[in-house]
Amino acid sequence: MRLRGVAGALLGAVVLVALGLMGVWWVFYPKKGDRGAAVAREPVLLHIDPAQMEAADEPLTLPPIERSRERMSAWSEQECLRQLEYPTEKAVQALEHANEKRIQQMLEAVP
């Protein structure tokens, strides 16, 4: 009974390998109509009208700026508080540590 299982597994493996090889052959082997088709093609010549290549007489104008909110000359305190984000103590300490590390590296690099 065990021999039958091994033979079946071996047969299945052979079939899978054969299918894989056929798939690779089918993808990479050129078809009968495609042989030499790339070599036989003639180059395509394009013609561009020289008038289209000339620069415009006037410089192009930029489109107007579209703002998402009305521009104010001065902000109220409420607007400032809404836009301002105070850093946390942890963020300040992390920044201080990174700055100290960079300063130390620069001082060590000085001869």
From Swiss-Prot:
Give the membrane topology: Single-pass membrane protein
State the superkingdom: Bacteria
Q: Which UniProt keywords apply?
A: Membrane, Transmembrane, Transmembrane helix
Q: What does the UniProt entry say about where the protein is found? A: Membrane
Gene Ontology terms: cellular component = membrane
| TM helices/strands, residue ranges | 7-29
Q: What is this protein called?
A: Uncharacterized protein TP_0368
Q: What is the lineage of its organism?
A: Bacteria, Pseudomonadati, Spirochaetota, Spirochaetia, Spirochaetales
